Amino acid sequence: NKSLNIHIQSTGNHIDVEPLTAADTTTLCEIYGVGSQSSISYKRRPMLLTTSKGVQVVCSIYGQPHGAEDIENNNYDGQFGLHLLDSMTHGSSSVDANHQAAIKSAVSIMSSKTINGVQVTVKTVYP
């Protein structure tokens, strides 16, 4: 049960994001069970994304820092990828099976969850 705030850097085939603060980078490291951002792997992790308007959708992330960064004081060197159902990679424009498996895992985990006293209903089809 960890949560972090992210900055959306860019969108396209999938969403490129970065931790908003140094504390959020620490949380991301905890999610991956590592002590520093340089040790975070490309292993996919199922997540529940909650937007600023309260909309919740399941997604998958790989936390490995890569590419450009917008925020210089968050102790994170670059960005990481956030994938939704049927999102594609930038390089090959293909759906990543490992991200899709993590999303399905998130569905099975979240379909029986209550968060802040509210039963979460997970939709696997996004508008």
Model-derived features with residue positions:
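Conserved small-residue-rich
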Residues: 1, 122-127
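Active-site acidic/histidine clusters and adjacent loop/turn architecture
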Residues: 2-5, 10-15
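Exported/periplasmic cell-wall-interacting domains
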Residues: 14-122
